[in-house]
Amino acid sequence: MTRAVVTVIGADRPGIVAGISSVLAEHNANIEDISQTVLRDLFAMVMLVDLSEADVSVGKLREELQKAGEELGVDVIVQHEDVYRAMHRV
């Protein structure tokens, strides 16, 4: 199974979750888990996404999510799950 971690950070505003999740849905990527919080006016979200049925590469998905993030005024980081875990190993 190919999975990615999608991290979204930026000023809180309506439509962020919808904008990011719609890009994932367009490419048959399945959101397995999601966590989000708002600290004052700062929005933060982490998604674990299954890409085994996706019709695009991780690189292309990253490009599209970053473009959507620019339109929404947020930063989007997309990493393979293994890379994410290696970077956050204690």
From Swiss-Prot:
Residue ranges annotated for the ACT domain, each copy included: 5-79
InterPro entries in the record: ACT-like_dom_sf, ACT_dom, UPF0237/GcvR_regulator, UPF0237_ACT
Signal sequence, renumbered to the chain: none
Domain of life where this protein originates: Archaea
HAMAP family with a match to the protein in the record: UPF0237 (MF_01054)
Database matches in NCBIfam families: PRK00194.1 (NF001220)
Family assignment from sequence similarity: Belongs to the UPF0237 family.
Protein name: UPF0237 protein MK1213
